[in-house]
Amino acid sequence: MPGLKRILTVTILALWLPHPGNAQQQCTNGFDLDRQTGQCLDIDECRTIPEACRGDMMCVNQNGGYLCIPRTNPVYRGPYSNPYSTSYSGPYPAAAPPVPASNYPTISRPLVCRFGYQMDEGNQCVDVDECATDSHQCNPTQICINTEGGYTCSCTDGYWLLEGQCLDIDECRYGYCQQLCANVPGSYSCTCNPGFTLNDDGRSCQDVNECETENPCVQTCVNTYGSFICRCDPGYELEEDGIHCSDMDECSFSEFLCQHECVNQPGSYFCSCPPGYVLLEDNRSCQDINECEHRNHTCTPLQTCYNLQGGFKCIDPIVCEEPYLLIGDNRCMCPAENTGCRDQPFTILFRDMDVVSGRSVPADIFQMQATTRYPGAYYIFQIKSGNEGREFYMRQTGPISATLVMTRPIKGPRDIQLDLEMITVNTVINFRGSSVIRLRIYVSQYPF
């Protein structure tokens, strides 16, 4: 019996002592054996592995491993405990071979899988999908992500974990949208300002070329960033609605655009001249047409065509009144031997001239001068007749000359006849006589 007792003791000790070289195999990857307690402790890879997760990923330690997840999705660590925190440090070592004796007992024990695993039909430890079996402890606002030997409680995109709850992330605070952002639970929506359209990326905005898509302008459309402007053709101005164009009345801007008349037309204007004038190359000034030179008049062969500003005059032949006699084409003389000529001007000379309507005053318009200067004689110049309106006066400019001055602007058309008298006084021979210039002034209708 003492020999049998020794054999049983050795067999039992063989069952409980670890197999040489197999101590590290008691802990799987991700765990390390604590030699003092004999327990398998989790390895914190996030601390021991340099740059375990890179970029914008965050390292989260798990029992037996670690996860790299986006920083916007913090991991909720479930409340389950370390499977190796109990006194059991299995799996158990294989049983020692039985003592080769038919009457000695053989001791064996069943295989056990660690926490998070279960035995399949082939006696293999396989991972338990806690998410599929609904054996997790994730909050209803969270989602369960199965891992090897465990699970992770995480949040969907658009949420972040805070004190076990998934809270909505306000993406609008981080400038995800180029222009307008509207936060919604778990997501966000980007929109664009008027004049822009959302690109396919759902975030950036692109200018809309309204001139190509709508062309709202009546005349010319110019696209701008986010909008457009309408422009009008020359001669038009933009209305208050910013779209329509209305004709610009250039003639109302200034009375000096045209010398005579400004005629407005859609988008432009033109200058016109009255009959008897032609428009010059500057398209604003009018020039008189000399009908007499162009033989574009209605005078008879006996009449003389006299050109005026804007017209012409047909002047009849000079007819001298008694007792005057015609000398030449434009002079009448009273014979000295005729007693009826004693108190009459010795000669009457006919002259014609024209002035424009409203001519600025004072204006020197005609000059009168004696042809001969006699010793001891002096000359007096005056307006004998036709100046009832006091529109003229004679200014003597020298001993034998004087100038007719117009003192008031005269509006045409109008014909004026003045008798300008030159009186000759000779004290040596006691002589006094006179000569007259009968000046016919034709005032035109227009001031040009």
Curated annotation (Swiss-Prot):
> What one GO molecular function would you report for this record?
integrin binding
Q: Which organism is it from?
A: Rattus norvegicus (Rat)
- Report the gene name: Fbln5
Cystine pairs annotated here are: C46-C59, C53-C68, C131-C144, C138-C153, C155-C166, C172-C181, C177-C190, C192-C205, C211-C221, C217-C230, C232-C245, C251-C262, C258-C271, C273-C286, C292-C305, C299-C314, C320-C332
Chief place of localization: secreted
Q: Where in the cell is it found?
A: Secreted; Secreted, Extracellular space, Extracellular matrix
- Annotated EGF-like domain ranges read 42-82, 127-167, 168-206, 207-246, 247-287, 288-333
Q: Where is the signal peptide?
A: 1-23
What does the UniProt record tell us about how this protein is modified after translation? N-glycosylated.
Give an example GO cellular component term for this record.
extracellular space
Keywords assigned: Calcium, Cell adhesion, Disulfide bond, EGF-like domain, Extracellular matrix, Glycoprotein, Repeat, Secreted, Signal
Q: What does this protein do?
A: Essential for elastic fiber formation, is involved in the assembly of continuous elastin (ELN) polymer and promotes the interaction of microfibrils and ELN. Stabilizes and organizes elastic fibers in the skin, lung and vasculature. Promotes adhesion of endothelial cells through interaction of integrins and the RGD motif. Vascular ligand for integrin receptors which may play a role in vascular development and remodeling. May act as an adapter that mediates the interaction between FBN1 and ELN.
- Give the family this protein belongs to, as stated in its UniProt record: Belongs to the fibulin family.
What InterPro entries does the entry give? cEGF, EGF-like_Ca-bd_dom, EGF-like_dom, EGF-type_Asp/Asn_hydroxyl_site, EGF_Ca-bd_CS, Fibulin_C, Growth_fac_rcpt_cys_sf, Nephronectin_domain
CDD domains per the UniProt record, alphabetical: EGF_CA (cd00054)
Record's protein name? Fibulin-5
Give the GO biological process terms: cell adhesion; elastic fiber assembly; extracellular matrix organization; intramembranous bone growth; negative regulation of angiogenesis; negative regulation of transcription by RNA polymerase II; positive regulation of osteoblast proliferation; positive regulation of transcription by RNA polymerase II
Residues that carry a glycan: N283, N296
Task: Give any Pfam family that matches.
Answer: EGF_CA
Q: Where is this region: Interaction with LOXL1?
A: 245-448
Q: Per the Swiss-Prot or TrEMBL record, what residue ranges does the short sequence motif Cell attachment site cover?
A: 54-56
What does the subunit comment say? Homodimer. Monomer, homodimerizes in presence of Ca(2+). Interacts with ELN. Interacts (via N-terminus) with the integrins ITGAV/ITGB3, ITGAV/ITGB5 and ITGA9/ITGB1. Interacts with FBN1 (via N-terminal domain). Forms a ternary complex with ELN and FBN1. Interacts with EFEMP2 with moderate affinity. Interacts with LOXL1.
